A protein has these predicted regions:
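Glycine- and acidic/polar-rich repeat regions and solenoidal domains
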Residues: 1-184
Length: 185
């Protein structure tokens, strides 16, 4: 592939995508994130994985995707990962970063954590989100990130278009969704 930065032997200075796929990732008791792409990393894709007690995380860098994963109970209180969500970002600077097509179940209705997100320029301070399925318990109210307050306000910012919210199914159903992801649909 010629990306415009190739030498005469076809080598490029642009890093190739690094994709983590088909994995069962169980975040241990003292773990914080399921995956942690930090400190300026780029071209990272977490796709088609099954996460338990942790989700995707970014700090600095660009060109990252968390797509087509099943994520169960990230951010569970009382664990080291408490407060960290389906997708967490700690810096609010984005270029080509996406959280799309995931299925995530939470215990409290908090789904995304974008600490630097600003609703007046959401497209440059938050991951692009779309076509996700969020499961919440009947006692929870889904909360939007980015100081947007409600889910409806988050979607009004152009985020999570095509995403749905549903009541959490049985644990057996959640496990079967994750198993299908890593074993093949």
């Amino acid at each position: 592939m010629n990306d415009g930065f190739n030498d005469d032997k076809g080598r490029s200075v642009i890093k190739a995508n690094d994709t983590q796929t088909g994995n069962l990732i169980i975040n241990g008791y003292n773990g914080v994130w399921g995956t942690d792409h930090d400190d300026g990393s780029q071209f990272q894709n977490d796709a088609g994985n099954f996460f338990i007690f942790g989700g995707c995380k970014n700090y600095l860098g660009n060109h990252k995707q968390c797509v087509d994963n099943v994520i169960l109970y990230p951010g569970t209180s009382g664990r080291s990962a408490g407060g960290h969500r389906c997708q967490t970002d700690d810096n609010g600077v984005f270029a080509e970063q996406f959280y799309v097509g995931n299925t995530c179940a939470t215990e409290d209705g908090r789904i995304l954590d974008f600490s630097g997100c600003n609703p007046t320029n959401v497209n440059t301070t938050a991951y692009r989100t779309a076509m996700n399925t969020y499961f919440v318990d009947s006692s929870s109210t889904l909360q939007g990130p980015c100081e947007s307050g409600t889910w409806a306000e988050w979607q009004a910012l152009g985020q999570d278009i095509g995403s749905i919210v549903a009541l959490t199914p049985s644990v057996a159903t959640l496990i079967s969704l994750g198993a299908a992801k890593v074993l093949g649909d």
